Structure formats: structure tokens, C-alpha cells
Amino acid sequence: MPKVVSRSIVCSDTKDQEEYNEEKPLNIYYCLCNKMALILDCTLEQLPLREVDNARVINANDHANKLTHNPTPRMVYIKRKSRGNGIEKQYRYKCRSCSLPLYYRHSPDSHVTFVMSNALIRNKGESPLTQLLNSEIKGSFKAPAAKPATSAGPDDSGIVDASGKKVVVTRHTKNMGKFSSVTVSTIDEEEDEIEAREIADSYANNARIIEKQLQRKGGKLSDVGIKTKTEDAPPPQKKQRGTLLER
């Protein structure tokens, strides 16, 4: 079994961003087609619930809101069995992008707007149908017993690199107060990979050292053969200097 060596990397932690979610004054909701549909000063769960159709009630006198929809409503009549087969008149407003019904009013100039059930999502890409199915499955089956959590255990996750091989990343998070935390991640690699990389680096370093030594001596590897030939030739005779010369 190959040995595992860890090395540290720099990473960012998004845990602190969740601390400021409650301080946001406005909440943005989107249609199922990811088109922005509602800006509200509170969450939809805080609005009154209409039990007849599970719609949320927005009163313009109590909550600041901005609705985005098709300005031309569609008038429909609904028969309510719970109210003695009464007829309810609705002016339904659709999404500008996908024409999905989002809101309805009992009169076009009313200050009370009803948000239809599961028509809006908080984040783009959410699927309310999947959430409903998951909630029903959780309600019908008993949840398994939770495993005891380890207090000091690291959080392990996997990252797939460019070669398609999974690299294990271990994250250690340390809380530094209410609004601060430090996360240190380590990547676990096999010792064979690290050894191969070190050998390649050592070969490159040795080649650079040899080249520098040859440059100091006066040439490169290609000049060694030429230098040996020049060294074999006899040195030139020195010119004699002076006024008294023997003849």
C-alpha cells in the first residue's frame, strides 16, 4: 500500500457569508425559469397563509414589495367546494418570460396580492417538485439514527484533477470568533507521485548547474571538442624584449 504525504494549500471558506444572510433588508425570489419575479422585505414563510390554496398573502400596506409580471391579467373563475360550491373570481398574473401563473388578485386595483403555492423559488436552479417529493418520502419513512459526530475530526472531500484521478482534500476549520473562521486544507498524494516529481526537478537542476559550470570555464557542451583540439597545439613563442640581445 503506497504511503500518503500531505501538503497544504490556500483555500477560501464561505461559512462566514451565512452569518450576514439575516441582515439583508430585501429578499429576492425567482420564477422557475430563473426570471426575477419578486422583491420583498421579508421571506414568503413570514407572510400569512391562505389555507384554501396554500397561497401567501402580500398586503402592500404592510410590506414593501416589487412585483415583476405580465401587466395583462387573465380572469378565471374557480369553484370552491369548501365554501359551499361558491365561485371565486381571480385575476391571474403570469411571468413575462415563461407565462407561468405567479400571482392573483380579486380585483385589478387591489392592494392585496396572493402568491401562488410553489410558484417562486429563493435561489436560481431550485426545483420545488423535487423538494416536495423529498419531503413526502421523509414523512413516509422513518429517518435513520444519526451517527455520533466527532468533535475534532476533519472534513474529507474529493476533487477530480485534469487527468481524471480523484485527489483527496482534507479541510480543518477553526472558529476565530462570531464572524471569523480559518480553514486549512491539505491534499493527500501518493509518495510515488511526489518522488517522480522530485526526480524530474533534480534532473533539471543538475542540467542547469552543469551548464553554468561550463559557461564559467568558457564554453558550452558543444565547444568541448573544439577546446581539446586547440589545447593539443603548441603555444606560440613569446617575443623577446630588451636592448642587449645575443647574436
From Swiss-Prot:
Residues with the modification Phosphoserine, per the entry, are S127
Residue segments, region Disordered: 215-247
Keywords of this protein's UniProt record, alphabetized? Coiled coil, Phosphoprotein
UniProt entry tagged with the keyword Phosphoprotein: yes
Per its UniProt record, what InterPro entries does this chain match?
A: STEEP-like (IPR029704)
Q: Name one GO biological process term.
A: endoplasmic reticulum membrane organization
A cellular component annotation (GO) from this entry: catalytic step 2 spliceosome
Q: Which residues form a coiled coil?
A: 195-216
Protein family per UniProt = Belongs to the STEEP1 family.
State its role: Molecular adapter that stimulates membrane curvature formation and subsequent endoplasmic reticulum exit site (ERES) establishment by recruiting PI3K complex I, leading to COPII vesicle-mediated transport.
The cross-references to PANTHER family, in alphabetical order and at most eight, read:
STING ER EXIT PROTEIN, UPF0428 PROTEIN CXORF56
Question: What is the name of this protein?
Answer: STING ER exit protein
**Which organism was this protein described from?**
Drosophila melanogaster (Fruit fly)
